[in-house]
C-alpha cells in the first residue's frame, strides 16, 4: 500500500519550510556557518523531538532555524524538501515561510526570499514540481510586527500567492490580525490561516469571517461545532489537515482517534499534509500511510483525499 500511496499524484498545502529541516542538514549548516549546537550529534537531536505540545515543539523549531543564515542555506533547505516532493509524487506544493523567524535574527528579508524562490524556480524546471509561496505571520508577535513584515514583502509581491497565520494559537485569536489581513487582501493576496488546531472552533469562525480566508489550516476542532461543520461543507472550504503532526503534538492522543476520515465522509474537503515533517516523523506519503495503518483508509478514500488537495490549490494549473 505504501508504494501505491507514494505513486498517487497529490499536492501539499500545509508545509513549513523551516519544519522540513532534517537533523543531518541542520548539523551540516551549523558546521558551514560555525554555529555551536546544544546537541552532540544527530541522534541526540532526534531524541529531543519527544515534545509534548505545540509550545515545546516551537521552542525547538526556532532553535533549529537559527542555523539558516545565508541565501545558499535557504536554497538548500527548500531544495531538499522539493526532492522529497519528487520522490513522493507531490506535483504541487504551497509552502509557508515565516520571515519574522529570520528577520528578528538579523537575516535580511531578501536573502531568505532569494534562496527559497531560487529553489522553487529550479524545482519547477528541473523536477517538475509546481509551487506557490505563502508568507506567514507569527501570531505570538504583534499585529504591528506583522504590518512591518507585509511592508517588507510588498516589493516582492509577485513572489507570493497568499499570506497566512501560524505559530502559538492559544491566546492569539485571528481577530488580533484583522487589520493586516484586510490590507493584504487589498494588495491582492489570497489569505489562509491556522485555526482550530489547539484553539477552539471560535477561532475558525473568526478566521473565516474576519480574515476572510480561502482555506483553513488544521481545522480539526471544527467537528465540535455542528453549525460550523455545516458551513464548511456547504461552502466547500478546504481544510489542510496534518495527521502525524496532530498526534505528535497531542491534538489527538493517537492516530486511531483522528477525525479526518469522519470529516471526509461527511463531505468536508479535507486534505493530507505533513506540516513540519522533519520534526513529526514523516512527509506526505507517511501521513497517508498512517491513515491506512491506523484508521483503515481505503484506496477510494486516499484518491478522494489526493484529489481534494489538487482541487484546493490556490495556484491553479
Swiss-Prot record:
- Cofactor: bound how, per the entry note? Binds 1 zinc ion per subunit.
**Xref: Pfam families:** A_deaminase
Q: Where is the active site?
A: 197 (proton donor)
The entry marks the following residues as binding substrate, namely 276
Per the UniProt record, the site (Important for catalytic activity) maps to 218
Q: Which GO terms describe its molecular function?
A: adenine deaminase activity; zinc ion binding
What sort of enzyme, by top EC class, is this?
Answer: hydrolase
| Keyword Transferase listed | no
Q: Which cofactor does it need?
A: Zn(2+)
Q: Give the UniProt entry's GO cellular component terms.
A: cytosol
Q: Which residues bind Zn(2+)?
A: 14, 16, 194, 275
Q: What is catalyzed by this enzyme?
A: adenine + H2O + H(+) = hypoxanthine + NH4(+)
Q: Where does the source fall among the domains of life?
A: Bacteria
The alphabetized UniProt keywords are: Hydrolase, Metal-binding, Nucleotide metabolism, Zinc
The similarity annotation says: Belongs to the metallo-dependent hydrolases superfamily. Adenosine and AMP deaminases family. Adenine deaminase type 2 subfamily.
The record's annotation in PANTHER family points to:
ADENINE DEAMINASE
- Function of the molecule: Catalyzes the hydrolytic deamination of adenine to hypoxanthine. Plays an important role in the purine salvage pathway and in nitrogen catabolism.
Q: What is this protein called?
A: Adenine deaminase
